[in-house]
């Protein structure tokens, strides 16, 4: 991940949804949308954003289109992605769960039930949170608190991405053999 300014990482700042999907996109090697042939003309899939708040030319445009195409990210409703909204801890867990191909559980005891605020996890996030906890990608705050709806700090995102990458054998890595050393783009440094 890059810093927020030269020589400044800002670990306690929150990470936006756009910054997270950009980090994942860069870790995946910045793939171009696949071309599709229609009536003899080649067209790029998802040339038009499905979200009103993801305009063509925005620094996060390609990463969001990639994330949607790969099934990694979804909008927040009403045709919006909310790129500037802080990513929550449960959103982060679910996004990484989707990156892993949404594997099924192993039937073991639910790790999520050990946390005092397990009931605060949104129903759509339970499976992803359970998966991330089981693999120790996600850890609790202050002991036994998940804080699922709270914003994820840049430090938490960096730690979770590192643990996520550590869980993969090289052949099964969802990012292929990409060795991206700069997965997060600063808002002032737009993607081409």
Language model features: what each stretch is:
Residues 2-63, 70-90, 98-126, 139-152, ...:
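Feature responds to low-complexity, polar/acidic, surface-exposed segments characteristic
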Residues 21, 93, 158:
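IQ-motif-like calmodulin-binding regions
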Residues 68-69, 133:
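Alpha-helix C-terminal capping/helix-coil junction sites
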Residues 126-129, 154, 158:
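Short amphipathic alpha-helical surface patches that serve as generic macromolecular interface elements
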């Amino acid at each position: 991940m890059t810093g927020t300014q030269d020589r400044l990482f800002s670990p306690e700042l929150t990470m936006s949804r756009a910054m997270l999907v950009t980090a994942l996109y860069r870790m995946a090697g910045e793939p171009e949308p696949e071309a599709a042939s229609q009536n003899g003309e080649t067209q790029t899939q998802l040339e038009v954003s499905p979200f009103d708040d993801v305009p063509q030319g925005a620094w996060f445009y390609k990463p969001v289109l990639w994330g949607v195409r790969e099934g990694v990210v979804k909008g927040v409703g009403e045709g919006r992605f909310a790129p500037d909204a802080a990513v929550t801890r449960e959103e982060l867990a679910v996004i990484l769960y989707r990156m892993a191909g949404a594997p099924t559980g192993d039937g073991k005891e639910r790790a999520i039930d050990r946390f005092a605020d397990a009931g605060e996890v949104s129903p759509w996030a339970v499976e992803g949170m359970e998966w991330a906890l089981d693999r120790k990608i996600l850890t609790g705050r202050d002991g036994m608190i998940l804080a699922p709806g709270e914003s994820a700090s840049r430090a938490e995102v960096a730690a979770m991405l590192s643990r996520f990458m550590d869980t993969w054998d090289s052949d099964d890595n969802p990012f292929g053999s990409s060795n991206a050393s700069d997965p997060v783009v600063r808002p002032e440094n737009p993607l081409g």
